[in-house]
């Protein structure tokens, strides 16, 4: 049987990959968005694992809320990237740092 420790190990690996993805690849905004999604997935796995282990549904409901927020964040982030790419022709983070505003 799979215990909570197994879920925590998978979640820790996903969280670490997400954090490393942000720190290692700072040039591509799409990769940074995918790394943030990995971090949110790791958080969701933790919420569901502890919720199932404790027999409480609050963690699972909150996990659905986090999934909804993550989907909205991804959609808005990609829409902003498409508009930025059409205007500038690149999605490099270095060029985004020079934005006016």
UniProtKB/Swiss-Prot annotation:
One of its GO terms (molecular function) is quinone binding. Keywords: Cell inner membrane, Cell membrane, Membrane, NAD, Quinone, Translocase, Transmembrane, Transmembrane helix, Transport, Ubiquinone. It catalyses: a quinone + NADH + 5 H(+)(in) = a quinol + NAD(+) + 4 H(+)(out). Gene3D superfamilies: 1.10.287.3510. The keyword Translocase applies. InterPro entries: NADH_UbQ_OxRdtase_chain4L/K, NUOK/Mnh_C1-like. It is an enzyme of class 7 (translocase). It is found in: Cell inner membrane. Its EC number is 7.1.1.-. Pfam families: Oxidored_q2. The keyword Methyltransferase does not apply. It is a multi-pass membrane protein. One of its GO terms (biological process) is ATP synthesis coupled electron transport. The chain crosses the membrane at residues 4-24, 29-49, 65-85. One of its GO terms (cellular component) is NADH dehydrogenase complex. NDH-1 is composed of 14 different subunits. Subunits NuoA, H, J, K, L, M, N constitute the membrane sector of the complex. Belongs to the complex I subunit 4L family. NDH-1 shuttles electrons from NADH, via FMN and iron-sulfur (Fe-S) centers, to quinones in the respiratory chain. The immediate electron acceptor for the enzyme in this species is believed to be ubiquinone. Couples the redox reaction to proton translocation (for every two electrons transferred, four hydrogen ions are translocated across the cytoplasmic membrane), and thus conserves the redox energy in a proton gradient. This is NADH-quinone oxidoreductase subunit K. The gene is nuoK.
């Amino acid at each position: 049987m799979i215990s909570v420790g197994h879920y925590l190990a998978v979640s820790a690996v996903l969280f670490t990959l997400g954090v490393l993805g942000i720190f290692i690849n700072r040039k591509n905004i799409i990769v940074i968005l995918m790394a943030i999604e990995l971090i949110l997935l790791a958080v969701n796995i933790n919420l569901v694992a502890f919720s199932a282990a404790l027999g409480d549904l609050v963690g699972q409901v909150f996990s659905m809320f986090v999934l909804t927020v993550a989907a909205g964040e991804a959609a808005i982030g990609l829409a902003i990237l498409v508009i930025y790419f059409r205007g500038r022709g690149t999605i490099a983070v270095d060029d985004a740092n020079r934005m006016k505003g």
